[in-house]
């Protein structure tokens, strides 16, 4: 099927709960904007006060804290590492540059040492030594993180998993893959596709990101709607703890109800509790029929109604439902020279179906498209069934992040909200910032309520940042959302955790960290707020 043609925002509640920090949560009633502005002012005041109490920078809670009293690397340390990892202990400043800077070029460390072990035993010996010497360590995979979690803040030793890239086993009956943590996601995808399977995870950064990093950040991605999160598909992990002990929970069983599910501690912990060295993951069969539809809607409300119709009519074959706004499309055309395949619309949708019967799937998709076109929910669209055309349509969603890098400095927010509220945040942020921002754009995963809010300016602008934060977190907390849907907290968001988690939960996280890493050498300054670290 080729190109085909056509044959309100909800208001803020008047009563809501502000939860900057649970100790200061209070129910507030607002009538109109002036009242709301007063409430926001009060909340910001208490947040700044609390940030001081936590030891954070009150002007910028996402800034780096003071360096903790870790030891510094000596020549004796380097001699040990060189003997342990001959030719794989990197100290050349030129070779260290890329590992010291995050993908967005917004966080830069000053590490003088990069270690590249090949085995779990190598990681174990490194951590045992570093723990005894009180040397801080920054685990690093593909370094594609967006919150400053994968690069050193100061002079932490970088422990790279890039050479831990072997597939140990694949069972083509159960679909269970066991591999080292440094395997690149795209390479695993190719490996599985040759065997008629696929990874349950797909990301725009798949050409660089490592499966260990995906697991340590609990990455979501484009297939979560169909296959669920990594907390469900990861069956087992091998993890090296801070003192060098190896925790082998590399199970290949779908059902194991013996005691606590310890692997869940390390999924999403961003390398602060242990270094993931191997993963076993359940992989689905490769679908025999894949279709991608790229559609246009004239309003976000129509987009939501299209999603509702889509879930009802496509059912079990629906594998992705993504969106991007017109501002995103403009950036794709401007910076990456990509072509919009349909007429201009305020909103665009990428729908993917995946099934085992091409005729059945195409019939269901045709019925769905006929319904949304007839009811005027969709104004224009195109459908692809060939691999090259499917890739071209997906690139319009996957390369938005890349296009944004050409706009100057980008403030990125990865928010989880009730689906009907996703785009309200984008619109409210535009009104809130006025002319301060160059661009405010929204895109993301409608299927799981995940908004990627991006705000650009010609260069780093502290006044703009002060206008964005904590407003974006207050807004999210008001609607009981999460300030991190899939990117993690890293360095940038660690002190904002109280917007999404009660103080009791954060305190318990600190207790777990203290138990597993009493010296705090693993990825310090990340994930947990400064009062816990």
UniProtKB/Swiss-Prot annotation:
<keyword id="KW-0479">Metal-binding</keyword>
<dbReference type="InterPro" id="IPR016167">
    <property type="entry name" value="FAD-bd_PCMH_sub1"/>
</dbReference>
<dbReference type="GO" id="GO:0071949">
    <property type="term" value="F:FAD binding"/>
</dbReference>
<comment type="function">
    <text>Catalyzes the oxidation of D-2-hydroxyglutarate (D-2-HG) to alpha-ketoglutarate. Also catalyzes the oxidation of other D-2-hydroxyacids, such as D-malate (D-MAL) and D-lactate (D-LAC). Exhibits high activities towards D-2-HG and D-MAL but a very weak activity towards D-LAC.</text>
</comment>
<keyword id="KW-0862">Zinc</keyword>
<keyword id="KW-0274">FAD</keyword>
<comment type="similarity">
    <text>Belongs to the FAD-binding oxidoreductase/transferase type 4 family.</text>
</comment>
<feature type="binding site">
    <location>
        <position position="412"/>
    </location>
    <ligand>
        <name>(R)-2-hydroxyglutarate</name>
    </ligand>
</feature>
<feature type="binding site">
    <location>
        <position position="486"/>
    </location>
    <ligand>
        <name>Zn(2+)</name>
    </ligand>
</feature>
<dbReference type="InterPro" id="IPR036318">
    <property type="entry name" value="FAD-bd_PCMH-like_sf"/>
</dbReference>
<dbReference type="Pfam" id="PF01565">
    <property type="entry name" value="FAD_binding_4"/>
</dbReference>
<dbReference type="Pfam" id="PF02913">
    <property type="entry name" value="FAD-oxidase_C"/>
</dbReference>
<dbReference type="InterPro" id="IPR016164">
    <property type="entry name" value="FAD-linked_Oxase-like_C"/>
</dbReference>
<feature type="transit peptide" description="Mitochondrion">
    <location>
        <begin position="1"/>
        <end position="55"/>
    </location>
</feature>
<feature type="binding site">
    <location>
        <position position="401"/>
    </location>
    <ligand>
        <name>(R)-malate</name>
    </ligand>
</feature>
<keyword id="KW-0560">Oxidoreductase</keyword>
<protein>
    <recommendedName>
        <fullName>D-2-hydroxyglutarate dehydrogenase, mitochondrial</fullName>
        <ecNumber>1.1.99.39</ecNumber>
    </recommendedName>
</protein>
<dbReference type="InterPro" id="IPR006094">
    <property type="entry name" value="Oxid_FAD_bind_N"/>
</dbReference>
<dbReference type="InterPro" id="IPR016169">
    <property type="entry name" value="FAD-bd_PCMH_sub2"/>
</dbReference>
<keyword id="KW-0285">Flavoprotein</keyword>
<feature type="binding site">
    <location>
        <position position="454"/>
    </location>
    <ligand>
        <name>(R)-2-hydroxyglutarate</name>
    </ligand>
</feature>
<feature type="binding site">
    <location>
        <position position="397"/>
    </location>
    <ligand>
        <name>(R)-2-hydroxyglutarate</name>
    </ligand>
</feature>
<feature type="binding site">
    <location>
        <position position="487"/>
    </location>
    <ligand>
        <name>(R)-malate</name>
    </ligand>
</feature>
<keyword id="KW-0809">Transit peptide</keyword>
<feature type="binding site">
    <location>
        <position position="487"/>
    </location>
    <ligand>
        <name>(R)-lactate</name>
    </ligand>
</feature>
<feature type="binding site">
    <location>
        <position position="401"/>
    </location>
    <ligand>
        <name>(R)-2-hydroxyglutarate</name>
    </ligand>
</feature>
<dbReference type="InterPro" id="IPR004113">
    <property type="entry name" value="FAD-bd_oxidored_4_C"/>
</dbReference>
<dbReference type="GO" id="GO:0008270">
    <property type="term" value="F:zinc ion binding"/>
</dbReference>
<dbReference type="GO" id="GO:0051990">
    <property type="term" value="F:(R)-2-hydroxyglutarate dehydrogenase activity"/>
</dbReference>
<feature type="binding site">
    <location>
        <position position="452"/>
    </location>
    <ligand>
        <name>Zn(2+)</name>
    </ligand>
</feature>
<feature type="binding site">
    <location>
        <position position="397"/>
    </location>
    <ligand>
        <name>(R)-malate</name>
    </ligand>
</feature>
<dbReference type="InterPro" id="IPR016171">
    <property type="entry name" value="Vanillyl_alc_oxidase_C-sub2"/>
</dbReference>
<dbReference type="InterPro" id="IPR016166">
    <property type="entry name" value="FAD-bd_PCMH"/>
</dbReference>
<dbReference type="GO" id="GO:0005739">
    <property type="term" value="C:mitochondrion"/>
</dbReference>
<dbReference type="InterPro" id="IPR051264">
    <property type="entry name" value="FAD-oxidored/transferase_4"/>
</dbReference>
<dbReference type="GO" id="GO:0006108">
    <property type="term" value="P:malate metabolic process"/>
</dbReference>
<feature type="binding site">
    <location>
        <position position="487"/>
    </location>
    <ligand>
        <name>(R)-2-hydroxyglutarate</name>
    </ligand>
</feature>
<keyword id="KW-0496">Mitochondrion</keyword>
<feature type="binding site">
    <location>
        <position position="445"/>
    </location>
    <ligand>
        <name>Zn(2+)</name>
    </ligand>
</feature>
<feature type="binding site">
    <location>
        <position position="412"/>
    </location>
    <ligand>
        <name>(R)-malate</name>
    </ligand>
</feature>
<feature type="binding site">
    <location>
        <position position="397"/>
    </location>
    <ligand>
        <name>(R)-lactate</name>
    </ligand>
</feature>
<feature type="domain" description="FAD-binding PCMH-type">
    <location>
        <begin position="107"/>
        <end position="286"/>
    </location>
</feature>
